[in-house]
């Protein structure tokens, strides 16, 4: 259905997954790609989105753009997480339908599954019991997105596919201490602690000039920097992380998520996502992950080893852990012809090397 000349709009092409999907498509010879930054196109604005689709008339759409963040952000900004994500999805999926887009790929999240879902989580676990409280608004928005895709397909015969990635990490990740996900946040915290531990103030100032922390940048005094970093559990002697470190998590390298996404975009149709002859068609989304898990503590220790931080690792058990276990069942993805290759140790090494290059992306809406 799609060929190398097809116009493909990647919504969120500067973000963690979007940038990787863009690069993957380019490497496969798809050069008629369209992307807009948040400044160029506000996906919360229905008029702007409609005008964009009127002008560009894409053949396919990859919707990676979302309002995202870690536990702290999800707890504090609950209205933002449900409202903004619903609005983005409503605008992009709605205009894709109005403009006859041939294929749409929607990226969700495994937080759609119940807090007490049986492990590993199959697609059929969706809506079987209550969600994790901390990110419930975000999860409900993502469930609405996948149900929009499913419902348009059933009512109008469209070809919209929803994929649910596990925890992702990789180039162009968000390392801001206030609102990033767990693995990049740990890399930055442990990196800064090592710099403080080795008295490498040049590296500390370079880091916080690139990504200021609550208004504190490299022009501030040593004490101001120390005080602010201590608020986030970063000291020369130790790094303090949220929770107990006991929750088990699965991590997928973002460039592999991109490869899986493009594989689905090019090779999987809606009819391939459910059993033929089913009386009730539901749970047509596809989990994307490794099917392997390890504890947050183990991840932190691997990062400590990679960065060579000689200080201590401490845990603040007064802070929430989130769901204790989240492992995807990826048998559906495997049956559709895709398997992961990059393991966690290699991924951490690659990501820290990328981080040291000093690249910073604006993650306001990616």
Per-range role (PLM):
Residues 82, 86, 134-146, 176-184, ...:
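Short-chain dehydrogenase/reductase
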